[in-house]
């Protein structure tokens, strides 16, 4: 165990005091881990659109002050009672959803939606005692999705930590703890395109490009990128995208455009925008008889869409996925190995790097739509 085990650690954290206001670097106190918890030192973290969405708090229950962040890589500092599969010094990726290994979902090979540790954006405290491990002068600071990686130290449930190869560079593989794995797994684990097949990807942000990367790894012969922003098309070529369709450039529905391009439809489609209009297009653009559409993007909670039942009766399949169907502890270490084996390229997702003291720049980049992922280096 480390020499700080069992003690309160004082460190820097980027605290969101209110919705939409710049984060403030504060000295926080991080309590020791309790039963089934692990305290980790964060070395690198990244900003995901989910952090920005809840920081803006335009459509959700606002919970402040809060420490955001959930794409990161770090090293175990100490473990709480009952933790046997991690020890101080282990390299880990904290993940917003977990794997308890005991519930029906964890025991099923088909599901990764753990009953105990499934994502909960409203909970700002730890499961074991309903309390926060962060405080400033005695005032609790709320957690975010069980990870809160915008802090030099954080406390995470053991089931939400993937133990990874210590040789893997944390400034690269930290991206695998959320968006990249979500898109990659949607293709590899759910859509499962065969070699030589045609794939359409709706939305060419980081998640969509990761889905395209999955299609590239699968040996797809054609990967059609669909996006309303034509300036994304050139960048997408690096991820295997071979053709581009901007729905605004056509009078007819984009699913009809794709059907004409592909002799009645693509074999697989992956929808990564959360737009219900795009969801309909993604489903209706797959080929009858064998086409599979996979929904990844998260819509507004009240959103609904409709399509004709004949689309199903003609043997098109519509699926949804959560975190690319990856189990946090069981599967993510092998995704890291894909990077280590040079199958998966992560460098091309990284468009910006900033020190922790300039974390608000990462928010500016994302709000302006500049780049894909910004790596935040915790040590100055």
UniProtKB/Swiss-Prot annotation:
Kindly state which keywords UniProt assigns to this record, in alphabetical order.
Cytoplasm, Metal-binding, NAD, Oxidoreductase, Zinc
Say which domain of life the source belongs to: Eukaryota
Q: Could you provide one GO biological process annotation from this protein's UniProt record?
A: formaldehyde catabolic process
Ligand binding (Zn(2+) 1): 48, 50, 70, 178
Binding positions for NAD(+) per the UniProt entry: 50, 203-208, 227, 232, 273, 296-298, 323, 373
A single cellular component GO annotation: cytosol
What is the enzyme's main class? oxidoreductase
Q: What's the catalysed reaction?
A: a primary alcohol + NAD(+) = an aldehyde + NADH + H(+); a secondary alcohol + NAD(+) = a ketone + NADH + H(+)
Main localisation, per the record? Answer: cytoplasm
Annotated Zn(2+) 2 binding sites: 100, 103, 106, 114
Tell me which cofactor or cofactors this protein depends on: Zn(2+)
What are the EC numbers?
A: 1.1.1.1
Q: Which InterPro entries match?
A: ADH-like_C (IPR013149), ADH-like_N (IPR013154), ADH_Zn_CS (IPR002328), GroES-like_sf (IPR011032), NAD(P)-bd_dom_sf (IPR036291)
Drop me one GO molecular function for this one.
zinc ion binding
Give the subcellular location.
Answer: Cytoplasm
Q: Does the keyword Cytoplasm apply?
A: yes
Could you say which protein family the record assigns here?
Answer: Belongs to the zinc-containing alcohol dehydrogenase family.
Subunit structure of this chain's protein: Homodimer.
In terms of PANTHER family, this protein maps to: ALCOHOL DEHYDROGENASE, ALCOHOL DEHYDROGENASE 2
Q: What is this protein called?
A: Alcohol dehydrogenase
User: From which organism does this entry originate?
Assistant: Malus domestica (Apple)
């Amino acid at each position: 165990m480390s020499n700080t085990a069992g003690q309160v650690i004082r460190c820097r954290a980027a605290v969101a005091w209110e919705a939409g206001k710049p984060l403030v670097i504060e000295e926080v106190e991080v309590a020791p881990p309790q039963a089934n918890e692990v305290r980790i030192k964060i070395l690198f973290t990244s900003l995901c659109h989910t952090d920005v969405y809840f920081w803006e708090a335009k459509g959700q229950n606002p919970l402040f002050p809060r420490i955001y962040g959930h794409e990161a890589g770090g090293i175990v500092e100490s473990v709480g009672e009952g933790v046997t599969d991690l020890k101080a010094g282990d390299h880990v990726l904290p993940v917003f959803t977990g794997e308890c290994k005991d519930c029906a979902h964890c025991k099923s090979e088909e599901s990764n939606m753990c009953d105990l540790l499934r994502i909960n954006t409203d909970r700002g405290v730890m499961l074991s005692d309903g309390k926060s491990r962060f405080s400033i002068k005695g005032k609790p600071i709320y957690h975010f999705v069980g990870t809160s990686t915008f802090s030099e130290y954080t406390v995470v449930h053991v089931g939400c930590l993937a133990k990874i190869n210590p040789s893997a560079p944390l400034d690269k593989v930290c991206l695998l703890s959320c968006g990249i794995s979500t898109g990659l797994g949607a293709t590899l684990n759910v859509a499962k395109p065969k070699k030589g097949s045609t794939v359409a990807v709706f939305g060419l942000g980081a998640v969509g490009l990761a889905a395209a990367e999955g299609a590239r790894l699968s040996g797809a012969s054609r990967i059609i990128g669909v996006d309303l922003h034509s300036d994304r098309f050139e960048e997408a070529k690096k991820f295997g995208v071979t053709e581009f369709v901007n729905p605004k450039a056509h009078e007819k529905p984009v699913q009809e455009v794709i059907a004409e391009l592909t002799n009645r439809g693509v074999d697989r489609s992956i929808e990564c925008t959360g737009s219900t209009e795009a969801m309909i297009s993604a489903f209706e653009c797959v080929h009858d008889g064998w086409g599979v559409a996979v929904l990844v993007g998260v819509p507004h909670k009240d959103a609904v869409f409709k399509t004709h039942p004949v689309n199903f009766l003609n043997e098109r399949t519509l699926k949804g996925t959560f975190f690319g169907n990856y189990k946090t502890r069981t599967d993510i270490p092998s995704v890291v190995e894909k990077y280590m084996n040079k199958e998966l390229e992560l460098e091309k997702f990284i468009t910006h790097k900033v020190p922790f003291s300039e974390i608000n720049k990462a928010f500016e980049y994302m709000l302006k739509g500049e780049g894909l992922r910004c790596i935040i280096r915790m040590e100055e």
